[in-house]
Every structure is written in structure tokens, then in C-alpha cells.
Amino acid sequence: MNMISKEGAFIMAKVFITLTGTKHYFGNDFLEKGTRIRLEKEPDNEYDKEAIQVKMKGLGKIGYVANSPFTVKGESMSAGRSYDKIGDKAKGRVIFVVDGGVVCRIINTGKEQNLVIEKEQNSD
């Protein structure tokens, strides 16, 4: 899944996740394409050991990475599939806001060897 660029940096293939559960926090009306998010693993979650919180600067937790076939949208990875692909913390960006979820792209996995290099700011 990873490739090495001419400069020797690792480039990760595009990985999408679905942000879900926003109605339990602030809703998703304020989210739009390009909004930056942070992902944080929550290994002590009593319901899901692969839970990944989604946070925003200034608001804190706004939801979770979807981990059910009923909440994962399109080509997104579930929290279970993406859990080992990110460090304890990662960064993402909103791509689409759709009914029942928000599709986001992981732009930095939080792992040194998996730094995502974006050639274009708005290539999505």
C-alpha cells in the first residue's frame, strides 16, 4: 500500500474513513470539504477496543470513525481496518458530507514512515 517517492519519502495510498456519531456531539452541519480533523485511538473504550475518536481544534470530540458495515460509507475503511494503519494520533480532512456520515481522508497517519505527501492542496 505504501510507495517510495524519488526523494525517498513514504507516500501512503489514499485512505478514507467515515466519521459517524456526530449527532451525539455537535451534529455535522458545520463540517464542510477541507475541514481538518484529528483522529485519536481510544483503547480503553468499553464498547469497542478499536475505537478511534474524531476531534476538532476548539471543540474536542465530534464523533468516531465508523466501525460497522451499516455506518461505513463508500470506499471508507472501518475503524478496525484502519486501526493498525495509524499511530495513536493521526490527521485527516473532510472530503464529503453525506446522509448518515462524513467521509474523510487520512492525510497524516501519525507514523513517521507513513507521512502522506500531498502534491495538491485540493486534489480531492
Annotate each language-model stretch with its function.
Residues 1-124:
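Conserved active-site motif detector
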